[in-house]
Amino acid sequence: MKTIITKDGDLEIITQYAKTYMDPPERERVGCRGIIIKDGKVLLSLEERKNVYMSPGGGVENGETLEECVVRELSEEAGLKVKPVKHLLRVDEYCFETLWVNNYFICEIDGECERHLTESEEYNGVKPVWIDIQKAIEIFGDYESKREDQASLYLREYTVLNKCRM
């Protein structure tokens, strides 16, 4: 896997290429992910069925801003009302035929609400978990032992969490 770091104004952009990718990609998916760190722990989403961790988030819907997307996604997946306080960075991830544009926001918790999972999230057993940040970095740092699609995701998350520690 190859990584390139650039900037767009103040926003750092990390471009990662999986072992297998198309350039140009067949499709692009723009999404947002929230980073919440509290008492040395980071909030992650766990897909129990696949035993896969990732930062909570998902795709931007039509007419939605990036900030609105991260607020909605953390509400749906984690049952949290959040306030995005900083657009930390963007990770452009080329994996197979898709370019995944992941916008990461540092968020603060502003309350709780009811979770609303998609059918797919229900099926995969998506749930919010708080994990010690060092343990999360270790989990994601094992990306080379994963199959290619998960390795790409774990490298992305590993890169982002290390940026949060700086």
Where are the regions that the model predicts?
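Acidic, metal-coordinating catalytic segment for phosphate/diphosphate chemistry
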Residues: M1-R33
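Conserved Nudix-box catalytic region and its N-terminal flanking loop in Nudix hydrolases
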Residues: C32, I37-E76
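Conserved hydrophobic "DFG−1" position in protein kinase catalytic cores
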Residues: I36, L44, I106-C107, W130
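Short loop segments at secondary-structure junctions
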Residues: D39-K41, E108-C113, I133-K135
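A short coil-to-beta-strand element that immediately follows conserved catalytic motifs
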Residues: K81-L89
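Active-site-adjacent beta-strand/loop module that shapes the phosphate/pyrophosphate-binding cleft
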Residues: E93-H116, V129
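Nudix hydrolase/Nudix homology domain
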Residues: E121-M166
